[in-house]
Amino acid sequence: MAMTIRDIAREAGVSTATVSRALRGLPNVDPVTRERVRQVAERLDYVVSPAASRLASGRAGSIAVITPYIARWYFGRVLSGIEKVLQGSDLDLLLSSIGDPSETHHVPPHRKLRRRVDGFLVISLSTDTEGVNEIFEADVPVALIDTERDGCWSVGIDDRDGARMAVQHLVNLGHERVGLISGRVMPTPFRPEESRWQGYRDTLVEAGLPVEDDLEACGHFTIEGGERAMTTLLARPNPPTAVFAMSDEMAFGALRSLRAHGLQPGRDLSVVGFDGHEMSEFLDLTTIVQPVEEVGARAAQALLDAIDDPTRKPEQVVLPLDMVVRGSTALRRPH
């Protein structure tokens, strides 16, 4: 027969309330009493019921992650970092994918979700996005990835600075017509994309180089989209000699398009990606490397800290970027 809290209390000579507090690690329990209760529970092979513990603590025992996508590389890696941290906690993960917020058919998180979780993690979505803004009405902590809001923890990178690093690298190589493969037409509800677009344009302006709509094409953050976008840029009357792709996957597609047109990446047209995808090394792609899994892990830990101590002042964490130069970029060839 399974042991109960009453059995522990009778054996340890304390009340059931004291046993409950001692086993849950709550304050106002004498250390000697806490240790005696722990030893009795261990001797009687007592197992704490997670459901009962959550009920007693007033917690739901889970957190919700709100993300636009699940299957795409970046979001999958962020989720991997989140899961690694949660494995060391007693919280479950509820995943809600709302789809592309720029499209009218996306599905917002159900309002009932607010009553089933102890906190929210929001990935890459503007806090004004429909279905996201409502979570701030819930009286639970919220941590943000790739965006910020007053009163919330946030973890991310400087996307504008990353784009500037990429474009400045191309400018330093002598390229005067630098193209862009973005995810979608601006403006966009994705803050990282908006920031990278601004960094791209700012760098060109500072270098005295042309900023033209004809130098930009949308790749929808897919390999196929990147290939189509590069093909579009190559067909322009005055095509670029270098291209910055907002993601490595779009850059992979751009490289495929170059080869299909008999062009050699680097020698004939330079390409820089953004992410640090594992395949970038095999494809010899110059890229801006971001610590994707660490972003997810740091955000998850921040949320756990906020759940444990709601009085903690939220922090905005910006993680560093790096650029790895490979064969897809080279000095501009004279005409």
Where are these regions (language model features)?
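Short beta-strand segments enriched in small/hydrophobic residues
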Residues: 16-20, 55-71, 169, 177-186
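Alpha-helical recognition/docking segments in bacterial nutrient-uptake
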Residues: 3, 62-168, 172, 335
